[in-house]
From Swiss-Prot:
This is Lys-63-specific deubiquitinase BRCC36. GO terms for biological process: cell division; chromatin remodeling; DNA repair-dependent chromatin remodeling; double-strand break repair; mitotic G2 DNA damage checkpoint signaling; positive regulation of DNA repair; positive regulation of NLRP3 inflammasome complex assembly; protein K63-linked deubiquitination. A motif (JAMM motif) lies at residues 122-135. Its main location: nucleus. Its cofactor is Zn(2+). Keywords: Acetylation, Cell cycle, Cell division, Chromatin regulator, Cytoplasm, Cytoskeleton, DNA damage, DNA repair, Hydrolase, Metal-binding, Metalloprotease, Mitosis, Nucleus, Phosphoprotein, Protease, Ubl conjugation pathway, Zinc. Residues 12-179 form the MPN domain. It is an enzyme of class 3 (hydrolase). Transmembrane segments: none annotated. Metalloprotease that specifically cleaves 'Lys-63'-linked polyubiquitin chains. Does not have activity toward 'Lys-48'-linked polyubiquitin chains. Component of the BRCA1-A complex, a complex that specifically recognizes 'Lys-63'-linked ubiquitinated histones H2A and H2AX at DNA lesions sites, leading to target the BRCA1-BARD1 heterodimer to sites of DNA damage at double-strand breaks (DSBs). In the BRCA1-A complex, it specifically removes 'Lys-63'-linked ubiquitin on histones H2A and H2AX, antagonizing the RNF8-dependent ubiquitination at double-strand breaks (DSBs).
Length: 247
């Protein structure tokens, strides 16, 4: 029995100007990842009517298939300066997030629309467009504060194997909670045994990696203590001999 997963956001509408800014920022360097924040609005609607006017048929199809439509509209982006020294990591500081929120409030007053920080974007130079485990964990952290928060990834500086030409891929993603073991009722016995053996093997490997150095340290410490005890016993015997000679 398949488990249907319902995400907090059903679609994302990225303005062309914001898309060009993200794309140019991603193509600005191939040596490290770049990042930024997205400003826009989140529309909630329980009807599938013409309120959302899109030129693409894909957006319209999504709006027709769901009962409660939650669509993120990204109108502007803010380019951020890197704060992580690792080239394959990006990190948004609280100060940067606060400054982006202030800018969103300014745009809200200027346009009269409920602008706010609705997501973040970053680049993947020379690697796949799919989010890494770090990206998924970071996205989950943001979604704890705002379920409508989305993440965008721009994969660039990659070559099409067939045409030998460069291409740029981009995607939008959100994090979801993993299925509980009780939901996996469709697994057969062989799969369960295999999963159990893999889990046991990984657990033993982790325990060995943790307990191995600890046991070695305890053995070295025991050897040092025994040697020190012998030295103390020898010193005690020498002192007893000196004491007996004085008597």
């Amino acid at each position: 029995m398949a488990v249907q997963v319902v995400q907090a956001v059903q679609a994302v509408h990225l303005e062309s100007d914001a898309f060009l800014v993200c794309l140019n920022h991603a193509l600005s360097t191939e040596k490290e990842e770049v990042m930024g924040l997205c400003i826009g609005e989140l529309n909630d609607d329980t009807r599938s009517d013409s309120k959302f006017a899109y030129t693409g048929t894909e957006m319209r199809t999504v709006a027709e298939k769901v009962d409660a439509v939650r669509i993120v509209h990204i109108h502007s982006v803010i380019i951020l300066r890197r704060s992580d020294k690792r080239k394959d990591r990006v990190e948004i500081s609280p100060e940067q997030l606060s400054a982006a929120s202030t800018e969103a409030e300014r745009l809200a007053e200027l346009t009269g629309r409920p602008m706010r920080v609705v997501g973040w974007y970053h680049s993947h130079p020379h690697i796949t467009v799919w989010p890494s485990h770090v990206d998924v964990r970071t996205q989950a952290m943001y979604q704890m504060m705002d379920q409508g928060f989305v993440g965008l990834i721009f994969s660039c500086f990659i070559e099409d194997k067939n045409t030998k030409t460069g291409r740029v891929l981009y995607t939008c993603f959100q994090s979801i909670q993993a299925q509980k073991s009780s939901d996996l009722t469709h697994l057969d016995s062989v799969t369960k045994i295999h999963n159990g053996s893999v889990f046991t093997k990984n657990l033993c490997s982790q325990m060995s990696a943790v307990s191995g150095p600890l046991l070695q340290w305890l053995e070295d410490r025991l050897e040092q203590n025994q040697q020190h005890l012998q030295e103390l016993q020898q010193e005690k015997e020498e002192l007893m001999q000196e004491l007996s000679s004085l008597e």
